[in-house]
Amino acid sequence: MPDLTPLWISIKVGFISTIIVSILGIFICRTLYKRKGHATQFLESLILLPIVLPPTVLGFIFIIVFSPRTFVGQFFQNVLHLPVVFTMTGAVIASVIVSFPLMYQHTIQGFRSINPKMLNTARTMGASERKIFYRLILPLSKRSIIAGIMMSFARAIGEFGATLMVAGYIPNKTNTLPLEIYFLVEQGKENQAWLWVLVLVAFSITVISMLNFANRDKVQEVD
């Protein structure tokens, strides 16, 4: 019977990071979806930066920012009592940063795809912006939001480079599935590595199939 600890650690990291990403994503998209201009474009570029930056660069930035010598690192360690470097907290933060762009992209596209005339009609009928958001925008964007959540969770489960640099490989503490596969191969244990490879492949196929099924239903509704 294989040790299932890496699986549970990955699920825990993915679950926590996805909750954080979902809340932040909806909140930030609510703030930005109606705004235009250079400032908004610059902010969106920063949000999407983790998609194109090499994981090692992200990991290096995380180590510098969350080092115990910095204000941010001291705040997490002394105020929140959550040391970041070489801990599960670091793995969660790394997963949040790399998966957030996916949540943002899907959610903001959902918000911006809503017909503005519908929202303006609601305003003329006396609906507040808060009511419009919760009664119209969120329900109409639910497919995009769910897709963003699924993609963010999948990305968090598969995160490797930044997690390795920030959280390291500490057995029973930070050894997520991608890290476990890497170090099993390093130790010449390919047969054990294959088990986790198949788990991740099956998980990825499941996520993609669910997204394709949801998109197919959406196309049928439009037709």
Predicted features by range, described:
Residues 82-123, 136, 148, 209, ...:
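Membrane-cytosol interface at the C-terminal ends of specific transmembrane alpha-helices
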Residues 16-47, 60-62, 110-113, 117-118, ...:
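Transmembrane-helix boundary motif in ABC transporter permease subunits
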Residues 19, 104-107, 111, 115, ...:
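Transmembrane alpha-helices
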Residues 35-43, 71-72, 129, 143-144, ...:
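Membrane-helix interface segments
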